[in-house]
């Protein structure tokens, strides 16, 4: 009998309360509930962890040491479990060498395609490259300067690992005595020992001769022999001058430029044979930036204008010598110098042997950087450096020879620079002849199919060349989802974490179709999700709760979406059915007459926009993925204001000007990055609560009697902490072929402090007791301490009363980290002139959590502050005072203002996808109780801002 259920019995991981759960196999099942209710504990830390652990245990001990191994979850049993694959939100890769193309493996297929049917062209003149004969190579050599000494060499080994003893012995047997190994001339009869773990290049010297009349016959024989030995390649090296690689296979008839036989590695920017020699395949160089090195262009260079190097007597003396040699006035502000003098000071004299031999300020600093052994000095200079586009490959990462190979008239870099939607069209348009079809038909099919999967999950605006480090968590997750769909596995359990993050409502349907496709292949798809449309389209829903933290971890309801909506105890069901809803403003705020304007925004795909952000209101920036929201708000607005207000060195995206910055005194970006990267960081330390708590304990009579200071109650320094575990509460035991085991410290019992410190109590609680408690409980204990109560209350207000005060920062999801940052800002004194920028703050939030978040944002705004939010959540969009909708599409088809105004005004714009979604909500067709509020009164109707328009400059 076939197993139809995944049965979980007695799940107790984290806050789960010994629950039993049945999950139908081969279904799309959604786990939902409040933040902190135990969703991830059930989906990832219990079900996925056990599935992965069982699979890894089937492998050999040798194989297990290379894999991340999961701890056995706290559960009685799980039956009917399939091999599990987790697709989480974590960023795909931080490596600058990883791109969308490499992580989806589409780039590997492109390398195969271009190496098999690509047409080489001359990188110099653009003509098709043809083969060169031995006679043509002889003519080239004879055209060199008379009496030039040349070596004719044959490449035997090119960039391969090994010792190559047999190859060199064979060369000696054939009468060859010299070769060049890794750039060094060696005698083949010597006992050479090459490191077999490193790449080597071996070129045997076939002949050495002087260019003069009468050597043609000997030269032709030598070239022919070299061709035979080198597989058609001949290297002609003019002693102490340039070297030229000739090929009997591929060479330009006019320029004489030869390229080696095309291989997949010729198109790899991670291989020395394909990578641009200047930037080594990165497409950019991290170098000293003149705009940063000259800290004030309005001042003379030696009087406040120059930053690094200004205190160096050697550099100052060199600059003074340049002044004497070229005759200009050093008292002139740097910006007043003509370009010629600026370039002279920055880059030095254009040729060696100039009047002064000056390297330039940048050259001097580079020289110091290379010679310095001081990490402090290196870190100091990093502040004056920027990533600039490589001047040789212009960001395309590959050698000129590789970039000159074309398929369908496009180079591989041209193809990877296209948005995926257009790359898909280009792949479909490739016409193959009979022979090409045999060679590359399957390759083109794979490329096309994988591009279709990426397009289907809403990533058509990305390019294959997009750096993986710049992808959001949601984009990275959808890329992995597309890769899994492409693998066409069956009988697998897929566990996903909020795949709808970052997706506009327009694209949500395609994502759900992709998940259903994965299910229809014969897989079980388990999704942690809060999105209403996803819950409605699920086959089965598991609702956890009823609260968060210790008040959660119970199975509230399970069944079909209809059964969840009819459940009287399900908070999720109450929101979806309309019994409960998120209230909307009855009247929208009017702007205070002030505004910040971004003029001429042209970064990335923005189309020279003029954008006005009214102050004193909540503005939501909307638009489909890739429409330019993050570029406008994070890359331009935030960086430009941070530069003006805080002298930030981070350069803003391209724009003409920012006006109105004088109307605010602070700009604060509240994102989802971790509040700390070590287990010692926690909400108490981040919000400043811990310092006040330590002061409180230091003031207690027991502490005064013993002479304890606040430092005694820190687990980060010696004195009061447990020295056995260094204040961590646990110790790590290495287990070789098993995962490392963390065991509770046997000295302090996991409490982090020594016995003397723990004996100090406030109202019967030690400081370790408080750190182990939920924030809401600590608030009750410390409610009479004003400076602590206010900060604890803000954590409760943003819906984080369930987290432990001392919970490790590394265990906090992005959504919780963002709300902790929001709570810290709420706890500060408000000036009413602060601009808050938030990027998708509803990530990881249940309907009820969104309600609490909106209450907090309204509080901030009512104090006179301004809030700008990038968001797709319709409840947040409906509660905005002002909407800026970008689009209409993503990538090159985006970057324009589609609509702007109040939600009611945007809802009337027919070409706005956001407007369509708002109209459905206002009309109640979304079947969400929150839509029943209808439109709010237009408090902005009398404002000075136009309701809609493109915002583009003429």
What kind of region is each of these model predictions?
Residues 1-954:
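Conserved phosphate-binding elements of NTP-dependent enzyme cores
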């Amino acid at each position: 009998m076939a197993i139809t259920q995944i049965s979980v019995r007695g799940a107790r991981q984290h806050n789960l309360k010994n629950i039993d759960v049945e999950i139908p196999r081969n279904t799309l099942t959604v786990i939902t509930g409040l933040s902190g209710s135990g969703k991830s504990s059930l989906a990832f830390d219990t079900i996925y962890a056990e599935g992965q652990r069982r699979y890894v245990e089937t492998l050999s001990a040798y194989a297990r040491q290379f894999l991340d191994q999961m701890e056995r979850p706290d559960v009685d049993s799980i039956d009917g479990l399939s091999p599990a694959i987790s697709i989480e939100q974590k960023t795909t890769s931080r490596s600058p060498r990883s791109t969308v193309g490499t992580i989806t493996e589409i780039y590997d297929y492109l390398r195969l395609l271009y190496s098999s049917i690509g047409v080489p062209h001359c990188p110099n003149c653009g003509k098709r490259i043809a083969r060169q004969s031995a006679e043509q190579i002889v003519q080239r050599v004879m055209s060199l300067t008379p009496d030039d000494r040349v070596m004719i060499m044959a490449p035997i080994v090119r960039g391969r690992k090994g010792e190559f003893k047999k190859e060199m012995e064979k060369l000696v047997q054939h009468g060859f005595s010299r070769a060049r190994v890794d750039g060094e001339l060696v005698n083949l009869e010597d006992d050479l020992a090459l490191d077999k773990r490193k790449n080597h290049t071996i070129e045997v010297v076939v002949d050495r001769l002087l260019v003069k009349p009468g050597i043609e016959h000997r030269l032709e024989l030598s070239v022919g022999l070299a061709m035979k030995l080198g597989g058609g390649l001949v290297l002609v090296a003019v002693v102490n001058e340039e070297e030229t690689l000739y090929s009997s296979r591929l060479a330009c008839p006019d320029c004489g430029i030869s390229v080696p036989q095309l291989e997949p590695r010729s198109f790899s920017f991670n291989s020395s044979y394909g990578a641009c020699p200047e930037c080594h395949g990165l497409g950019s160089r991290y170098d000293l930036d003149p705009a940063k090195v000259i800290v004030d262009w309005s001042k003379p260079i030696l009087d406040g204008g120059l930053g690094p190097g200004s205190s160096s007597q050697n550099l100052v003396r060199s600059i003074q010598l340049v002044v004497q040699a070229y005759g200009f006035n050093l008292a002139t502000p740097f910006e007043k110098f003509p370009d010629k003098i600026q370039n002279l000071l920055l880059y030095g004299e254009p040729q060696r042997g100039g009047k002064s031999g000056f390297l330039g300020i940048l050259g001097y600093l580079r020289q110091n950087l290379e010679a310095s052994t001081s990490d402090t000095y290196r870190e100091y200079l990093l502040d004056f450096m920027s990533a600039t586009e490589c001047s040789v490959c212009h960001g395309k990462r590959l050698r000129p020879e590789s970039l000159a190979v074309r398929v369908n008239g496009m180079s591989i870099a041209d193809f990877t620079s296209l948005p995926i939607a257009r790359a898909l069209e280009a792949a479909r348009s490739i016409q193959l002849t009979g022979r090409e079809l045999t060679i590359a038909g399957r390759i083109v099919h794979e490329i096309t199919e994988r591009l279709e999967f990426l397009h289907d999950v809403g990533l058509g605006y990305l390019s294959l060349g997009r750096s993986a480090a710049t992808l959001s968590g949601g984009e990275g997750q959808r890329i992995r989802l597309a890769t899994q769909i492409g693998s066409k596995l069956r009988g697998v359990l897929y566990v996903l974490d909020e795949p709808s993050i970052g997706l506009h409502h327009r694209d949500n349907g395609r994502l759900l179709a992709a998940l259903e496709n994965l299910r229809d292949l014969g897989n079980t798809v388990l999704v942690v999700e809060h999105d209403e449309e996803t819950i409605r389209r699920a086959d089965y829903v598991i609702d956890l709760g009823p609260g968060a933290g210790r008040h959660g971890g119970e199975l509230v309801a399970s069944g079909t979406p209809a059964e969840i909506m009819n459940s009287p105890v399900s908070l999720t069901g109450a929101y979806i059915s309309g019994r409960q809803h998120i209230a909307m403003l009855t009247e929208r705020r009017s702007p205070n007459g002030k505004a910040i304007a971004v003029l001429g925004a042209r970064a990335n795909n923005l189309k020279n926009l003029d954008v006005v952000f009214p102050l004193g209101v909540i503005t939501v920036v909307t638009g489909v993925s890739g429409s330019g929201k993050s570029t406008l708000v994070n890359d331009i607005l935030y960086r430009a204001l941070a530069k003006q207000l805080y002298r930030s060195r981070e350069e803003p995206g391209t724009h003409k000007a920012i006006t109105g910055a004088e109307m605010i005194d602070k700009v604060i970006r509240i994102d989802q990055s971790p509040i700390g990267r070590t287990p010692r960081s926690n909400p108490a330390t981040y919000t400043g609560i811990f310092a006040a708590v330590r002061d409180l304990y230091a003031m207690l009579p027991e502490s005064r009697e013993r002479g304890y200071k606040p430092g005694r109650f820190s687990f980060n320094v010696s004195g009061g902490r447990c020295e056995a575990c260094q204040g961590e509460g646990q110790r790590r035991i290495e287990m070789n072929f098993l995962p490392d085991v963390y065991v509770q410290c046997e000295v302090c019992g996991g409490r982090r402090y020594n016995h003397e410190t723990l004996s100090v109590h406030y109202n019967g609680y030690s400081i370790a007791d408080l750190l182990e408690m939920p924030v809401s409980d600590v608030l009750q204990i410390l409610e009479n301490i004003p400076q602590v109560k206010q900060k604890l209350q803000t954590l409760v207000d943003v819906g984080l009363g369930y987290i432990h005060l001392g919970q490790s920062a590394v265990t906090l999801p992005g959504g919780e980290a963002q709300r902790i940052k929001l709570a810290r800002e709420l706890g500060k004194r408000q000036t009413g002139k602060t601009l808050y920028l938030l990027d998708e703050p509803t990530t990881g939030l249940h309907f009820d959590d969104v309600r609490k978040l909106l209450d907090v944002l309204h509080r901030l705004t009512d104090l006179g502050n301004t809030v700008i939010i990038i968001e797709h959540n319709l409840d947040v969009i409906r509660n905005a005072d002002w909407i800026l909708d970008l689009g209409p599409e993503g990538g090159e088809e985006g970057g324009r203002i589609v609509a702007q105004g109040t939600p009611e005004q945007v809802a009337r714009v027919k070409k706005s996808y956001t407007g369509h979604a708002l109209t459905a909500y206002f009309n109640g067709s979304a079947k969400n109780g929150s839509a029943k509020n209808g439109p709010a009164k237009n408090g902005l109707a009398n404002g000075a801002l136009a309701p809609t328009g493109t915002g583009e400059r003429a």
